Amino acid sequence: MSGNTFGKIFTVTTCGESHGDSLAAIIDGCPSNIPLCEAYIQLELDRRKPGQSKFTTQRKEPDEVKIISGVFEGKTTGTPIGLIIKNQDQKSKDYSEIKDKFRPGHADYTYFKKYGIRDYRGGGRSSARETAMRVAAGAIAKKILKHYGIEIYGFCSQIGSLKIDFIDKDFINQNPFFIANKNAVPACEDLIHSIRKQGDSIGAEVTVVATGLEAGLGRPVFDRLDASIAYAMMSINAVKAVSIGDGFDCVAQKGSQHRDEITQQQGFLSNHAGGILGGISTGQDIIAKLAFKPTSSILQPGKSIDVQGNDTTVITKGRHDPCVGIRGVPIAEAMLALVLVDELLITRSYRD
C-alpha cells in the first residue's frame, strides 16, 4: 500500500490500524534545534483523543505519545523523528458479526476490491484512528510555524443544519464541540442527543484559519498553495468537500463584490479569496472550510452485500462518533500546519 507519506521537504509517514498494536509516524526534514518534548505533543493529542465527552465515541484511548528518535536533550537533531502511540482500548469482538459484510458508506468494499484482503476491525487502516499521528506530527509543525509568528486555529462552524456564529475564539477549547459561541452549546447538546437517540449520525462543517503569514508563500499552477491545502484536507477521513475563502458562495457573487480591493493605507479591504491569489499567499488570514459527512457506522440497519456478493443487512454495534466533524477540528489544524511548514521550508530553500 502506497500513499502513506505526506509532504515534500517536511515529510510525515504514518502506519498503524484502528485495532492494531500501535500507531506510529516518522517525521523527516524537521530543522534541528527546535525545542520539543512529549508533553508538548500530548497537548494537541489530548484535544483529539476519543472518550472525552458523551458527545463523541466512548472508546477511551489515552493516546500517550512516545518520542523514540530525533530528539536529544529536549531539542530536535535534524534526523528523522519517530513517534509511537499504543492502542489500549480495542474491542474487536464488536466487529465479529460483520467481518464478512461490507458496511455501507465505509471503505470496506473498496479496500477488499483493491487488495483482496481487509482488516474488518474498526476499518483497519481506513479508520480515523490513523489521524492521531497526523495530529502528533502537526504539533511539531505548529511549533516551527509559531517561531515565524504563524498561528493556526479551527472551530466547528456548523453541525447538521445548525449554523454556529463565530463569537469568541477563546471559547473554542472550552467546550466539547469546538465551537466559538457559548450561547450555541445547548442547541448543539440537544442536536447530538437527538441524533444519538435515533441511532443515527450527522455531518458538520469545520473552519480552519492560519494567521500571521507573509505574502509569497506557495507556488503557481500545479503547486498552488490552495491546491495543496485542498489535497491535505481531502485526505482526512469523512471529508467530502473543501472550500477556500468564500468558496461556493462566490458562485452567487458579482466580480465587483468578490474581488479583494487594495489601498495604500489599509491594504486589502476584504478577504473573499481566503488569503490566497494565484496559488500564493497574500499575507492575509488563510481560511478553509471542510465538509464532514455523517459517519456510516450507525445503529440503524442498512442494505449491503457480503464478501460472496450476497445481499445482507448491516448494523454497526461498535463505539462511534455521532458527529465525526467535532473531533475533526484538531485534525484539520494539523493538516494545515503540515502544508504551511512544508511550503515555508520550500520557500526558504528557493531564497537560500
Curated annotation (Swiss-Prot):
It catalyses: 5-O-(1-carboxyvinyl)-3-phosphoshikimate = chorismate + phosphate. InterPro entries: Chorismate_synth, Chorismate_synth_AroC_sf, Chorismate_synthase_CS. GO terms for cellular component: cytosol. Its cofactor is FMNH2. GO terms for molecular function: chorismate synthase activity; FMN binding. NADP(+) binds at R48. GO terms for biological process: amino acid biosynthetic process; aromatic amino acid family biosynthetic process; chorismate biosynthetic process. Its EC number is 4.2.3.5. It holds the Pfam family Chorismate_synt. Reduced FMN (FMNH(2)). Pathway: Metabolic intermediate biosynthesis; chorismate biosynthesis; chorismate from D-erythrose 4-phosphate and phosphoenolpyruvate: step 7/7. Coiled coil: none annotated. Keywords: Amino-acid biosynthesis, Aromatic amino acid biosynthesis, FAD, Flavoprotein, FMN, Lyase, NADP. The keyword Repeat does not apply. FMN binds at R125, S126, S127, N237, A238, G278, K293, P294, T295, S296, S297, R319. This reaction introduces a second double bond into the aromatic ring system. Homotetramer. Belongs to the chorismate synthase family. This is Chorismate synthase.
